[in-house]
Structure formats: structure tokens, C-alpha cells
């Protein structure tokens, strides 16, 4: 038999649990947000499902790191969800010292603003599992929050 190990990053989608929907809801409520750019590997649930289907059909074995084609940035995600909700949010670097300091003391701050990503080369496959673009996936999540 063959063993296929998947090591996906944060999985998100409509009605998902965890930090991503909290971030989306925060974007619709907060008047101000730090301009602390980062890089995040993420994977939309439909793209994960397609990867699993392809792995089964092709009888893949090994360790795989599926992720979206584009690396995400928390600031850009906040901008997207705020705009989709018709909410104005002021993104400023004035709060960055608090993010830097808070990341050492508070785990949730570190989780939100830290850079966590796989090298995109690790995720390239001979088949296409990216059925939904990053922007379209954000739109679907935003629509599910309405």
C-alpha cells in the first residue's frame, strides 16, 4: 500500500472554524489596524478537497505541502474583508511597536502577525488543484459572513 501525508497550512472556507473567520469578523468591526505585513501559507477548503481527490486517483505516496498559489498577507486580508463589508478601517504603522512588543508576550498577537509559509516550490505538482483563486476564495468567505 502507499502512504500519502499531507501537511497543509491553515485551511479556511465558508463557515470554517478557527482564526480565519475571527480575522474576517474583526476586519468588519475594527476602526484601526496595524500595517504589519507578513506572509502566510493558506489553503482554501475546495482546493484541499481537489488535492485529496487527485492524490487518491493518482495513488500518490510521500509527503506533500499543498497551499494556495499566492501567499497571503494579514493586512491585505483585513483590507479585503473591510471593503467587502462596506467598513472603513484605518491601516497605520503607528501601532506596529505594540504588535512587535505584544508578539513576545501574547500568543494570539504572534499568531495573527507572524510570518508562516512554505516555499511555494514545495507545493508545485504535475496536476492543478487550484480550482479557486485566492481572491475568489475570500469573496466566498465574505459572502458566507453576511
Regions found by a protein language model. Name each.
Residues 100-126:
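Mobile cap/lid helix-loop segments that border enzyme active or cofactor-binding sites
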Residues 1-14:
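Conserved beta-loop-beta element that borders a ligand/cofactor-binding pocket
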Amino acid at each position: 500500500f502507499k502512504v500519502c501525508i499531507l501537511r497543509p497550512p491553515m485551511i479556511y472556507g465558508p463557515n470554517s472554524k478557527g482564526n480565519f473567520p475571527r480575522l474576517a469578523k474583526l476586519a468588519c468591526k475594527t476602526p484601526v489596524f496595524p500595517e504589519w505585513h507578513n506572509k502566510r501559507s493558506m489553503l482554501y477548503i475546495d482546493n484541499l478537497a481537489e488535492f485529496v481527490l487527485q492524490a487518491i486517483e493518482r495513488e500518490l505516496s510521500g509527503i506533500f505541502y499543498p497551499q494556495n498559489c499566492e501567499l497571503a498577507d494579514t493586512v491585505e486580508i483585513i483590507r479585503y474583508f473591510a471593503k467587502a463589508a462596506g467598513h472603513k478601517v484605518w491601516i497605520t504603522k503607528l501601532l506596529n511597536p505594540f504588535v512587535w512588543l505584544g508578539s513576545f508576550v501574547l500568543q494570539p498577537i504572534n499568531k495573527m502577525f507572524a510570518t508562516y509559509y512554505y516555499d511555494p516550490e514545495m507545493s508545485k505538482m504535475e496536476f492543478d488543484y487550484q480550482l479557486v483563486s485566492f481572491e475568489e476564495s475570500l469573496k466566498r468567505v465574505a459572502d458566507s459572513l453576511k
